[in-house]
């Protein structure tokens, strides 16, 4: 018996990340090779022509799982009955723009989108915010959708997680697939804290294998935290394919389960590990049956606590900067 199509809304559909994302969703990489999808694509009025071009290419791939495509500039059309919503579109920082202005510009976008999701999306919609500042944008969307369960809103920390994995693989000379229990705490920003104290590679402790706190502090964390800037420097454009890949990983694990593996998701806190409730924070989680669960009982040493406090402070400042816009 063929499955009924799932409706996947993608905002910023004409953008670089969208272009890397849509073909993989239509190919079944995100929701499974037996799951038909209907893509509901949102972008600004001036981008509609570009979205049409992308849709022509999607048609030309003749994906067996692509059951339909909707193109719109109206969030209520894009989010109608959506099972999954990938909020990729966000206002990028332009030259001379203060972070405060960026937060405010995005707060307006994500308030509108949160309200539209609240009105028309499936009550079980799984929302992933990719557009930066991702944690705070996800917080705004969640707060603007009081009738949806707050745990349905998540922010993308998976790119930081995958970047950390690849750095550990390079350092240990082991394949990425052999590394487990690595995760990232906090904000999707250079303050994130990638934590390999519990990680193993082929069952061996990564911490013991590397055994180099100076490398951790001076090389590993800055490399992972500033990787986005390094890619802009090298490529002249921000990371798009790797961000799309991380979004696919995040949603795939959330929907289909992580098979016991620990992954990282930005999720609303319930006070776990001393993080104030409602903060959209990167946590180690496992996923099963469409739900995520925070890994409990991890010891936080003094160094880790200091790093967590730094990223939390940044998130609290961002949150304070948009509070007046949330009514």
Curated annotation (Swiss-Prot):
Record InterPro entries: L-lactate/malate_DH, Lactate/malate_DH_C, Lactate/malate_DH_N, Lactate_DH/Glyco_Ohase_4_C, Malate_DH_type2, NAD(P)-bd_dom_sf
Binding of NAD(+), residues: 12-18, 106, 113, 130-132
Active-site residues (renumbered): 188
Example of a GO biological process term: tricarboxylic acid cycle
Binding site for substrate: 93, 99, 132, 163
Key words of the record: NAD, Oxidoreductase, Tricarboxylic acid cycle
Catalysed reactions listed for this entry: (S)-malate + NAD(+) = oxaloacetate + NADH + H(+)
Pfam families: Ldh_1_C, Ldh_1_N
Source superkingdom: Bacteria
EC number(s) given by UniProt: 1.1.1.37
GO molecular function (one): L-malate dehydrogenase (NAD+) activity
Family, as annotated: Belongs to the LDH/MDH superfamily. MDH type 2 family.
Protein task: Catalyzes the reversible oxidation of malate to oxaloacetate.
Name of the protein in its database record: Malate dehydrogenase
Species for this entry: Cupriavidus taiwanensis (strain DSM 17343 / BCRC 17206 / CCUG 44338 / CIP 107171 / LMG 19424 / R1)
